[in-house]
Amino acid sequence: MMKKCILGLVAGLTLGANIAMAAENIYPISREMGSGTRGAFTEIFGIQKELKGKKIDATTTKAEVTNSTGVMMTTVANSKNAIGYISLGSLNDTVKAISVEGVMPSVENINNKSYKISRPFNVVIKKSNPLIEDFLAYSINAKAIIEKSGYIATKTKKFVSKKPKGKLVIAGSSSITPLMEKLVESYKSVNPNVVIEIQQSDSTTGVNVVVEGIADIGMVSREVKEAELKRGISVRVLAIDGLAIIVNKANPITNITKDSVYKIFTGEMTTWDQVK
């Protein structure tokens, strides 16, 4: 009898611990305003509200704001109850990606359209020149580099550089920056006559500095807005990227519904025991 009571007590304590953990507060982590990743995320999951006929971001003010992909991942990796979102190509083993509606984020699942949470990696320019055209032609058709980095290439034409001389300044999205760094390094091996500077910030800044003539190429990790196009820029798709929902590796959750993501990031769902 004593043994049964002890076992029952241990089981009860274990169950209680699990319930307590499951009911812990959710710690939503967001990207900053102006981030293309945030823009794509809020649009895909409908985390928006109407204001004077326009849809605006409705992310809860209780979410912690991070200013880059790297900071997002570090924050989630260091908090057991955190949940955030990143570029699929940036995913590493410091955090855990979870499935959405039962489908894991992967290049294969984006290609077969079972995982629908994806967005374009765009580049924008205002003024063109032979160096810009040569570099973009190389980058957009760099299928091996794009796919090895975890993204989906959209074009595969054969490229022969004309090796123009000059300097390029490329600025914008922190999500696109890691891929762009690889493309720049590879392009320099084909065309050693070029100097290329990359300035990491966010997608909106990427558009603004191109419009203002500060940068030659802007990196935009979301759809380019109609109002931005009216400022005289043109857009090209560099690659397709998935968005991954990430949690701490100690979190037992493996799947989440789109509705739960919406409710977490609008502040309607605040504890893990509510998550479906």
Summary of predicted features, one role per range:
Residues 1-5:
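Positively charged n-region of N-terminal signal peptides that target proteins for export
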Residues 21-276:
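Exported/periplasmic ABC-transporter solute-binding proteins
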Residues 8-17:
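Bacterial N-terminal signal peptides
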